[in-house]
Amino acid sequence: MRAAQEPPSLVIRGSFRGLTGHDHHTREFARHLARQGIRLQLADFANWHLVKLPDDARDPWFEQLTAPVPAEAVLQFCMPHQVVASGSRLTVNYTMFEACPVPAGWVARGRSHDLVIVPTESSRQFWLAGGYPPDRIRTCPLGADVDRFRPGVPPLALAGPAGRPVSDYRVRVLNVCEPQPRKNLVGLVRTWLTATSPDDDAILIVKLSLSSRAAATDLFRRLALMQQSLGRSLAQAAPVLFTNRLFAEAEMPGLYAAASHYWSLSRGEGWDLPMTEAAAAGLRLIAPRHTAYLTYLDDDVAQLIPSRLEPADTSGTPWAAALFDGSQWWAPDEDAAAQALRHAIDGHDQPRASARDRLAASFTWPQAAARLTGILADLHAEHGRPF
């Protein structure tokens, strides 16, 4: 127990030493909760992803948050089946899902948690569709760093597949993803092949996160099969730059600055950190009309692609099948996506409003941390615990 006048305390458990968006939002919430005056103990969830930040790219501040604090709750950034029971402390799980409904096992595990927090209304609805009690789930959007990601940042120097500098192309379309079925990278490249020609002054930049040589081999096998089925090759379209380069966090603003547009053809998103970073950087946006995108995008700030629900197909990806079996996700309309690309390449995609201004007004990290603090304070009060 502690005196009521002491500052709030919280234990956070989540992966924070890696390169994933999950690691990023664990770090940002920790950073901004601390700035709100909350004393933190940070415990790493080391098994979230194999790829970690190099030692010299890690902020040593996070490594200092190991001392115990007199917390009454543990906030765990992970999937529900990865939550570790916290004894007498309140158990809070911040998680997200990209298809409907969430797995039945998640709902069963979630019933043992004191609170589930998700970033978007779409994730909340997916939990409710699975039968989760509505009074045990709250929504707290993630944030965007509009100071670090902004117009005017010097672009990274990148070269296209033929050696021409990326900066020489008038239209530079970026996609950042880990190639898995939900991200629909094969569909994205297929749409590029059908929408563009070598005469277009445009390039597609695909920043890949490949965890192994086998993953790379499988991706390019699937791309080769797609080209064979389509009857059209990469050589018959505007150039595509695939890069698996490991960018330090300090380099990421320059990567966005190297692009003019950001494009996703994802089948479902819990948030899509790269899309929000691209919006903060001032890029023009093309996104499917579904899930998390509808939290911070609309027709005024982006080209939105119509999408239809379909059964989630995770063929050949056992780990994804375990999550998405029995769920539905979205199939973006590739013809509409091709038309959106043509609007971008032909210069007919001027947005009516600024996505960056929208993020700066409503979706910054200080705002996200303040919302989360309020949710946690309410939970402690409901259970008669000091925060």
Model-derived regions: residue spans:
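Aromatic "clamp/platform" in nucleotide-sugar-dependent glycosyltransferases that forms part
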Residues: R267
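N-terminal pre-catalytic "stem/leader" segment of glycosyltransferase-like enzymes
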Residues: M1-P70, F387
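Short hydrophobic beta-strand element within catalytic cores of glycosyltransferases
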Residues: M275, R284-A287, V301-I305
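Extended catalytic core of nucleotide-activated donor transferases of GT-like folds
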Residues: V11-R13, D44-G131
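Conserved donor-binding/catalytic core segment of Leloir-type glycosyltransferases
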Residues: V11, A162-K183, V189-W192, L204-V206
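Nucleotide-activated donor-binding/catalytic signature segment of Leloir-type glycosyltransferases, i.e.
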Residues: S212-L246, A250
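Acidic anion/phosphate-binding donor-loop and adjacent secondary structure
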Residues: A104-G105, A144-R164
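A charged, aromatic-enriched C-terminal amphipathic alpha-helix characteristic of glycosyltransferases
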Residues: Q328-A336, I345-L376
